[in-house]
Amino acid sequence: EARNDYLQKRLTQMEDDVRTADALERENKRLRELCNLRDEHADYVFEDAYIVSWDSSSWKNAFTIAKGTGDGLAEGMAVVTEYGQVVGLITEIGSNWATVTTVLDNSLEISACVASSGNTGVVQGAYTYGYPNKLRLNYLPAETILRNNDQVVTTGSSLYPKGLILGYIEDAGMDETGVAKYAIVQPAADFDTLEQVFIV
């Protein structure tokens, strides 16, 4: 009996150790990717933050982080993953908190281009077009050639640095006007597993 108790406690301890090791490995991977991101964008400062809550009334459209003006953050700052994937924008802020509106919200419009061709357009959340959890790249020239998995990146603006990854093209067509093309884009950021973000 005592031996069984000992073995059970030992097994529980080993399971805890494995969970801790897995968490440390994920953190280590995030930090390595952040180092790469900082090397690629040496002219920007990145502040890390953890997500403390998601807006329950939305489709991954907004979340709160536990950092704010007291940490040097400001409304309008871009938010990315450790891989340089665009998550969204700070839209409300307090001294020790901030609300991030994600790219899935169609109120955000981001100047973007198809990396392979350089054709530019505007990305916004595609929920109102019947594509929840997707993006839509609008206002592309009619002659634009689009291929599945073409990368869509930011063109650079006062809000978003150039070359950040928005996502990958899944589908395309002519828009409602019949004079421009659009593309449906799978976001690069995985909103289902997002825990930590970086503010640019």
Model-derived features: positions:
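A secondary-structure micro-motif
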Residues: 1, 20-23, 30-200
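N-terminal membrane-targeting segments
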Residues: 1-13
